[in-house]
Amino acid sequence: MDSSFTITPRFSIKLLEKALRLYTPSLAERPMAEFLADKCDDLGFENVRIDEVGNLIATIGSGSPRVLLCGHMDTVPGKVKVRKEGDYLYGRGASDAKAPLMAMLLAASTVHRNNGTIIFVGAVDEEGNATGIKNLAKQKLDIDYAVFGEPSGITQVTIAYKGRIAINLKVNVGD
């Protein structure tokens, strides 16, 4: 698409509708990764690639800050017919998390014009064993900020999650 292309609400809705029609349970996200790769190419992203575990990774813009926009491509298993009712679009993954992923894709395609680099990632296996994000962490991306498009509430931005880490620590104190 040329730089004068304007992202319209109709374009955005059609993009999400196409994404929702792709059946992408954990570890079967390849159709979504290929769909996103094509859209990234169309929207002017650079270095568009699908990594060894199936994550879609693309960059746009240059310089600082370097912002990661990451969402997951997989859904829980089971097919749900895509349908539109009034202003609402329903389908497997509509909120968790294909809509946030499409929103970040479209935002990245325009916001980079304000300077900086956007690294857009569609991660695999979030609903399973987090294969995608684990592989992404190993790549040690040079980023300043990260935004994860995961539905966590509608009244405020989620800063962090409570979590759990299990560590097996052995300390050798000598003799």
Per-range role (PLM):
Residues 61, 170-174:
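Solvent-exposed residues in well-ordered beta-strands and their adjoining turns
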Residues 64-122:
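Active-site metal-coordination/substrate-binding segment of hydrolases
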